Amino acid sequence: MKTKILSLANEEVGEISLNKDIFAVEFIRDDIIKQVIDWQRAKAMSGNHKTKTVSEVSGTTKKPFKQKGTGNARQGSLRSVQMRGGGLAHGPIVRSHATQLPKKVRKLGLIHALSEKFAEGKLLVIDSLKLDKPKTSFLVNILNKFQGQSFFVIDGNEVDINFSLAAKNIYNTVIVPQIGANVYDIIRHEYVLLSQEAVNVLEERLR
């Protein structure tokens, strides 16, 4: 399956053959894409939320008032969950939110996400992702030629330092090496830009 290669000026400079089993899957499995995104987002959660239980709240252990004769409901501690300033019952604790997902499913998710973008016409192959200087304004002018609101840029094994520095201050533009290609960023950005090297490495990786 052939597609055109574009320059950073959004001009056609050649053709490249893409593996249809990676970039043009016939039936897009949105359920697999969602599974992988849920796995990614859960793994990214810090899990450092914490509330104090009765045993952790600072305060006296003295009984608030005598058991009988006051007309109040009996109380054993000022730190109980029903008391103002007391502990919290069944509150969040520090934990990992990460879940398990088979590598095969993760791989399928990436394939289906790439195929979905290609089917939408929003996966573009760029001949080179290298800049002469790390100028943000220069890169903004380049990206404006693609008329997109957000860009996920995937380079080969290494990212060009000038491109990376220029993209740092551009809203909704992310550049990663091929190892950083992930379903969440592919789906949440409008356009996916792949270098020729990224195409070759991804085809080898996802074969």
Swiss-Prot record:
InterPro entries according to UniProt: Ribosomal_uL4, Ribosomal_uL4-like, Ribosomal_uL4_dom_sf
The record's annotation in PANTHER family points to: 50S RIBOSOMAL PROTEIN L4, LARGE RIBOSOMAL SUBUNIT PROTEIN UL4M
- Taxonomic lineage from the root: Bacteria, Pseudomonadati, Pseudomonadota, Alphaproteobacteria, Rickettsiales
One Pfam family name is: Ribosomal_L4
Q: Name one GO biological process term.
A: translation
- Could you list this entry's UniProt keywords, alphabetically sorted: Ribonucleoprotein, Ribosomal protein, RNA-binding, rRNA-binding
Similarity comment: family membership: Belongs to the universal ribosomal protein uL4 family.
**What is the role of the protein in this entry?**
One of the primary rRNA binding proteins, this protein initially binds near the 5'-end of the 23S rRNA. It is important during the early stages of 50S assembly. It makes multiple contacts with different domains of the 23S rRNA in the assembled 50S subunit and ribosome. Forms part of the polypeptide exit tunnel.
HAMAP family per record? Ribosomal_uL4_B (MF_01328_B)
Which superkingdom, per the lineage?
Bacteria
Q: What gene name is listed for this protein? A: rplD
Summary of subunit composition and partner proteins: Part of the 50S ribosomal subunit.
Please report the name of this protein according to its UniProt entry: Large ribosomal subunit protein uL4
Q: A GO CC term?
A: ribonucleoprotein complex
Region annotation (Disordered) maps to 50-76
Show the NCBIfam families listed in the entry: rplD_bact (TIGR03953)
What molecular function does GO assign, one term? rRNA binding
